[in-house]
Amino acid sequence: GIIVKQEIIADLSRITEEEQAILDGKTEVEKERYSSGQKFVMDAGKLLERGKLIDIRPHTRFIRFPAHSHNYVEMIYMCQGSTVHTINGERIELKTGELLILNQNAVQEIEPAGRDDIAVNFLILPEFFDQTLRMIGAEENQLKDFIVGCLKSGEVPLCYLHYRIADVLPVQNLIENLVW
């Protein structure tokens, strides 16, 4: 409901320690916080609690994230406002209520989000999808192709899915329940 959504937004709107450092003048993303190698690859080992297959964290605002990839699947849900992403060179504006899912082959850049641009990132290890694939069964569809691509290494044709679902109430309620 609306009250729950307002509580979620209020909770997610709080300035984090990382965001405060940015507001105090830090001009670049602290790559060590997210990545351990030379290349800027977001590392689940640094971001996910040990033993978890999936976790949720608020998107860091006020700073541009340079081109990076992930060693996990990232699902971004736009709670309020919008964010601009460039995925493998293609510009995507993620608006309130929309969902963007990236596999490990996606190279992502993110423009700075403002104070009222509230997004949550779901970090999902590829192993999470093993069971999902068994449940989907044999029929061919875009989601299945995407999940199979998440489990493979190397180039796959479909590296992101963008769902414009702001008007799909059951999906909105499901995501709200996941976040809260």
Residue ranges: model-predicted function:
Residues 31-67:
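Short, contiguous, helix-prone interaction/anchoring segments in small proteins
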Residues 2-27, 43-47, 113-180:
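A hydrophobic/aromatic-rich effector-binding and dimerization subdomain
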Residues 13, 24, 35-36, 69, ...:
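Generic serine detector
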Residues 52-144, 148-150:
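N-terminal regulatory/effector-sensing and dimerization cores
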